[in-house]
């Protein structure tokens, strides 16, 4: 099993190219199920989760050709309307095939999802929404089995803001009969990116980027060409790394309009940030100052950035409080950071971090995707050598992170 070996204490300098967004690419790839025509995608990241979803889609009969960051999809020969447990258990985003299959073919059988260990993240909002659109849904032997001759447009108010729930219901509504209104919809940029692709495919969607989406169902969707947006979480991760260890790094192919909260907190920590249309420069010459924050839905502070900013706070000047409101179990990285010498205590949904003068390298273990990224940042700041185990979590959502960091001066290598 691969591990990362990191020698800490090196400043970062140079340029890093940002990849396409994982959380946009996954639903966008599933949208290929909605049409028999060809969908051409670019800026698709090279990630384990993308490989997994493509394997699942191919198993259903979707043709998918991949060349670098380009993927060409064709859904004219789909012959299997099932997502089996073996495929879904490794990645909960597989649930995103449910809406498209049901809308286009009138039936879908999808295993209840697996994925991260950071919380239950139930799919009940997906199911309730599809039932409101007229689907018959049963759960038996660990599978969601949904049927509908034709989904009917309706008004859906989700009990909570759910990104994948919004995406699933949005895709289903594009081919439904009549008007669907999604209230309390997720506003994340990745949802907006999916909606923009669907419009390019012929969908009629109003309110894109707001919490109220109005969809007029159409008879069929056609092919389209689309570039996946830049990954704001990867961008923030590298920004955080520079702010933690110091240096001067320019991030290319980045989006600045989705990172307001990260900009605010990094400037509060003492980083100097400048940016253009597709680049961000991060300069840090001093020890960071501690920053407190509370995770919440977009446009608030993303839960997917929580662990990385906590790593920065570990070596920051002062004390900070981090309140996690989205997922339970999302402080699993704390124990590993404390092994490196951090001073973090947990009180319910709040982590209290007292910045220390230095971290010291030690063997640690990644527990989930963003936790693994936070351990990389902490290891870059630590004195001596850190060995991070179970980095398959990292590969799920970061495109060759160690290669990108090595290019800007980090002493990091992948070992067996």
Swiss-Prot record:
GO molecular function, one term: UDP-N-acetylglucosamine 1-carboxyvinyltransferase activity
Keyword terms of this UniProt record: Cell cycle, Cell division, Cell shape, Cell wall biogenesis/degradation, Cytoplasm, Peptidoglycan synthesis, Pyruvate, Transferase
Top-level class of the enzyme under EC nomenclature: transferase
Keyword set includes Cytoplasm: yes
Main location class: cytoplasm
Binding-site list for UDP-N-acetyl-alpha-D-glucosamine: 92, 121-125, 304, 326
Amino-acid positions noted as binding phosphoenolpyruvate in the UniProt annotation, renumbered to this chain: 22-23
Keyword check for Oxidoreductase: no
Gene Ontology CC, one term: cytoplasm
A Pfam family: EPSP_synthase
Intracellular or extracellular location(s): Cytoplasm
One GO-annotated biological process of the protein: cell wall organization
Catalytic reaction(s) noted: phosphoenolpyruvate + UDP-N-acetyl-alpha-D-glucosamine = UDP-N-acetyl-3-O-(1-carboxyvinyl)-alpha-D-glucosamine + phosphate
Superkingdom, taxonomy of origin: Bacteria
Pathway info: Cell wall biogenesis; peptidoglycan biosynthesis
2-(S-cysteinyl)pyruvic acid O-phosphothioketal: residues bearing it: 116
EC code: 2.5.1.7
Gene3D superfamilies in alphabetical order: Enolpyruvate transferase domain
NCBIfam families: murA, PRK09369.1
Record-given protein name: UDP-N-acetylglucosamine 1-carboxyvinyltransferase
Organism: Janthinobacterium sp. (strain Marseille)
Annotated gene: murA
């Amino acid at each position: 099993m691969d591990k990362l070996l990191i020698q800490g204490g090196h400043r970062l300098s140079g340029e890093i190219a940002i990849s396409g967004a994982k959380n946009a690419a996954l639903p966008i790839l599933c949208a290929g199920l909605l049409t028999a025509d060809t969908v051409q995608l670019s800026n698709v990241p090279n990630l384990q989760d993308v490989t997994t979803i493509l394997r699942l889609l191919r198993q259903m009969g979707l043709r998918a050709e991949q060349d670098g960051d380009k993927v060409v999809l064709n859904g004219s020969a789909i012959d299997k309307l099932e997502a089996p447990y073996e495929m879904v258990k490794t990645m909960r985003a597989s649930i995103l095939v449910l809406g498209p299959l049901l809308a286009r073919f009138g039936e879908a059988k999808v295993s209840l999802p697996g994925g991260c260990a950071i919380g239950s993240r139930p799919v009940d909002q997906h199911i309730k929404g599809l039932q409101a659109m007229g689907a018959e849904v049963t759960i038996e032997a660990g599978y969601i089995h949904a049927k509908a001759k034709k989904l009917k447009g309706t008004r859906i108010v989700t009990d909570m803001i759910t990104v994948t729930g919004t995406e699933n219901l949005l895709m289903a509504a594009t081919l439904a009969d009549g008007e669907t209104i999604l209230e309390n919809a997720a506003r994340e940029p990745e949802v907006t990116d999916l909606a923009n692709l669907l419009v390019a495919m012929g969908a009629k969607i109003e309110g894109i980027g707001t919490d109220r989406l109005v969809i007029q169902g159409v008879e069929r969707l056609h092919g389209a060409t689309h570039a996946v947006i830049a990954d704001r979480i990867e961008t923030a991760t590298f920004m955080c790394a520079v702010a933690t260890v110091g240096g001067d790094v320019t991030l290319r192919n980045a989006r600045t309009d989705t990172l307001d909260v990260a900009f605010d907190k990094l400037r509060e920590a003492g980083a100097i940030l400048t940016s253009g249309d597709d680049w961000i420069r991060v300069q840090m010459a001093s020890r960071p100052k501690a920053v407190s924050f509370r995770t919440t839905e977009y446009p608030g502070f993303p839960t997917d950035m929580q662990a990385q900013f906590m790593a920065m706070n570990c070596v920051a000047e002062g004390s900070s409080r981090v309140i996690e409101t989205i997922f339970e179990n999302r402080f699993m990285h704390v124990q590993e950071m404390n092994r490196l010498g951090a001073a973090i205590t947990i009180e319910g949904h709040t982590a209290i971090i007292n910045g220390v003068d230095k971290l010291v390298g030690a063997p640690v273990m990644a527990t989930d995707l963003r936790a693994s990224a936070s351990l990389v940042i902490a290891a870059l700041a630590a004195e001596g050598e850190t060995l991070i185990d179970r980095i398959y979590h990292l590969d799920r959502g970061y495109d060759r992170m160690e290669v990108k960091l090595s290019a800007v001066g980090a002493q990091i290598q992948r070992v067996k």
